[in-house]
Curated annotation (Swiss-Prot):
Keywords: Cell membrane, Disulfide bond, Glycoprotein, Immunoglobulin domain, Membrane, Receptor, Repeat, Secreted, Signal, Transmembrane, Transmembrane helix. GO terms for molecular function: interleukin-1 binding; interleukin-1 receptor activity; interleukin-1, type II, blocking receptor activity. It is found in: Membrane; Cell membrane; Secreted. Non-signaling receptor for IL1A, IL1B and IL1RN. Reduces IL1B activities. Serves as a decoy receptor by competitive binding to IL1B and preventing its binding to IL1R1. Also modulates cellular response through non-signaling association with IL1RAP after binding to IL1B. IL1R2 (membrane and secreted forms) preferentially binds IL1B and poorly IL1A and IL1RN. The secreted IL1R2 recruits secreted IL1RAP with high affinity; this complex formation may be the dominant mechanism for neutralization of IL1B by secreted/soluble receptors. The keyword Repeat applies. The lineage of its organism: Eukaryota, Metazoa, Chordata, Craniata, Vertebrata. The keyword Cell membrane applies. Residues 1-13 form the signal peptide. This is Interleukin-1 receptor type 2.
Length: 416
């Protein structure tokens, strides 16, 4: 019985529910180690590497960088609060221009006095963490455009791609988003063969990029809140570089099939190896049935993560994640493709989502059961062998009990 109890306990240990990985360690934006803030029970994780640079009079959304680490959306008992470093008062307080929505802090419209360090604090029953991020609000003039620009690079004589960044919170359907593109102060004509629509209004293709295409671009979106319209401007500095020796990108993940449970949240990273010791202009994105993700899923159930480039052991990588929130049956019949391209090469890798019907594995359960049967069988055979041995011993001893036969040669007498 003791053996059976141990083996049954082993079965329960083997059949723990499967865990779907929804995050990546390499995506952590924190470079400093955790250290406690003096006089507080919270762990301070440091400052986010990215500063928010915005224009006065426009909407601003600050996203708490702690959320990917703590997953506040998965716990109804978690508490996320905001404060400013120069004030002990929690936000929004009495400020009508500020409010908290899920894991984000909204400021609408922003003014220059909103510049500063903001701290988001995450608490639950077990722990408390803090992280800071910087907001800088500039005067909305052309002189400020270079200060708030996103740097994007295109190779000479290739098809360039401009991306209007950081609009996730403002676009519910990217196919319906109204975005206008400018080069300097000149509105780009949609019929211009030089600048092509990519099907997604947040992206603009540049045909046969030349040195003359370098410069400052603007994408302007109209956002309506409580009946009032606001402009959201993103400035881009495009640099055109001559063709250099580019590494051939190698897509090393994902796998051909990704196991997932229907209704669960799933993150599938596309990891691309870019060689060692060299910079790269490789662009990575996802497609669903040969369609951009933002177009295939206009409501945002499936989205792309940030373009994350990093180094490990002097090896360069870039990752872009495909985020399902949640996984549905539609995804099981969809051909997802990760694409990596640079002036030297074009690579793609297909993957599909496969439903995991149950976290219980009969194969794992039957293995200990088979072991139980073998142990019980071995015990039974051993006992049976003991009984057979006892009977044989009794039979071989019978002749020695007969006194008619002498037991020693000395007892034999000669008959006369």
């Amino acid at each position: 019985m003791f053996i059976l109890l141990v083996l049954v306990t082993g079965v329960s240990a083997f059949t723990t529910p499967a865990v779907v990985h929804t995050g990546r360690v390499s995506e952590s934006p924190v470079t400093s180690e955790k250290h406690p803030v003096l006089g507080d029970d919270c762990w301070f994780r440091g400052r986010d590497f990215k500063s928010e640079l915005r224009l006065e009079g426009e909407p601003v959304v600050l996203r708490c960088p702690l959320v990917p680490h703590s997953d506040t959306s998965s716990s109804s008992r978690s508490l996320l609060t905001w404060s400013k470093s120069d004030s002990s008062q929690l936000i929004p307080g009495d400020e009508p221009r500020m409010w908290v929505k899920d894991d984000t802090l909204w400021v609408l419209p922003a003014v220059q006095q909103d510049s500063g360090t903001y701290i988001c604090t995450f608490r639950n029953a077990s722990h408390c963490e803090q992280m800071s991020l910087e907001l800088k609000v500039f005067k909305n003039t052309e002189a400020s455009f270079p200060l708030v620009s996103y740097l994007q690079i295109s190779a000479l004589s290739s098809t360039g791609l401009l991306v209007c960044p950081d609009l996730k919170e403002f676009i519910s359907s990217r196919t319906d988003g109204k975005i206008q593109w400018y080069k300097g102060s000149i509105l780009l004509d949609k019929g211009n063969k030089k600048f092509l629509s990519a099907g997604d209004p947040t992206r603009l293709l540049i045909s046969n990029t030349s040195m003359g295409d370098a410069g400052y671009y603007r994408c302007v979106m109209t956002f309506t809140y409580e009946g009032k319209e606001y402009n959201i401007t993103r400035n881009i500095e495009l640099r055109v570089k001559g063709i250099t020796t580019e590494p051939i990108p190698v897509i090393i993940s994902p796998l051909e099939t990704i196991p997932a449970s229907l209704g669960s949240r799933l993150i599938v990273p596309c990891k691309v190896f870019l060689g060692t010791g060299t910079s790269s202009n490789t662009i990575v994105w996802w497609m669903a049935n040969s369609t951009f993700i933002s177009v295939a899923y206009p409501r945002g159930r499936v989205t792309e993560g940030l373009h994350h480039q990093y180094s490990e052991n002097d090896e360069n990588y870039v990752e872009v994640s495909l985020i399902f929130d949640p996984v549905t049956k539609e995804d099981l019949n969809t051909d997802f493709k990760c694409v990596a391209t640079n002036p030297r090469s074009f690579q793609s890798l297909h993957t599909t989502v496969k439903e995991v019907s149950s976290t219980f594995s009969w194969g794992i359960a039957l293995a200990p059961l088979s072991l139980i049967i073998l142990v019980v069988g071995a015990i039974w055979i051993r006992r049976r062998c003991k009984r057979q041995a006892g009977k044989t011993y009794g039979l071989t001893k019978l002749p020695t009990d007969n006194q008619d036969f002498p037991s020693s040669p000395n007892q034999i007498k000669e008959m006369k």
